[in-house]
Amino acid sequence: VVKSFSNSASCIITDLFPLPPWTQWVKNTAQSATCPVIEVDCHCVIPMTLFGKSVDRPFKFRDATKKMRKRLVQQSWPENDITVPKYDGELPFNPVDVEKQVANIENRYKLLVDCSIDPTVFPIWRERGGEVVSLAKWQRFLDKNLSSYSRRRNDAADPKGVSRLSAAFHYGFLSPMKVAREASAVGTKSAEKYLDELLIFREHAWHHVFSTDTPYCSSNLPHWAIESWNNTSDDPRPVILS
């Protein structure tokens, strides 16, 4: 589908995701496309292409990026007044009529059967995705729970002590730039700690992965983790959960 569109598109803009197989997919598309292919870092306030180095401790990443982070964290997205013509060409796939095919529960299951989805993994019905739900979840946390984040975040039994927005960031339902900008405007100790987790510990990992050619290799783990792993390799494991 992407290859078909790349032959008629004026420009391809995609998410910068620095892990195989996505990196190779983008390279293949760029080689065959007849138009520019642009990757945009939608994960980090400090773009991976701007820093993109590996440092062995989060506090070193914090110090190395302090000036850039201060400049970018409260920077709003530029507003562009652009009118894009609607695509009316032939589609290289069979489109889904959401109102007719997804609204009906039987048709919905028929669509799922056609997808490459493991049916033995059951959905978590109480969790919903999408931009609207994610924005509402962030707003609730911002209004009611951010003020107590530094005190409650380490209590695993407290479901409201943290934002629970990792999935929203991962699947692109919610921009971490928006969250960072709005949390930064609060200016409290809890907001500062939340930003520390969001912008230091989280982005430190993204930049490390971007900098290495072997992101899945165990050598990316710290020495203490590898040592612990090796020391317990012979431990009995009657059940392997994988």
Language-model features, listed with the residues they occupy:
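Trp/Phe/Arg-rich N-terminal binding region typifying the photolyase-homology
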Residues: 1-84, 190
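Glycine/tryptophan-enriched, flexible segments
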Residues: 54-232
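Short, intrinsically disordered, charge-balanced linker/junction segments flanking boundaries
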Residues: 237-242
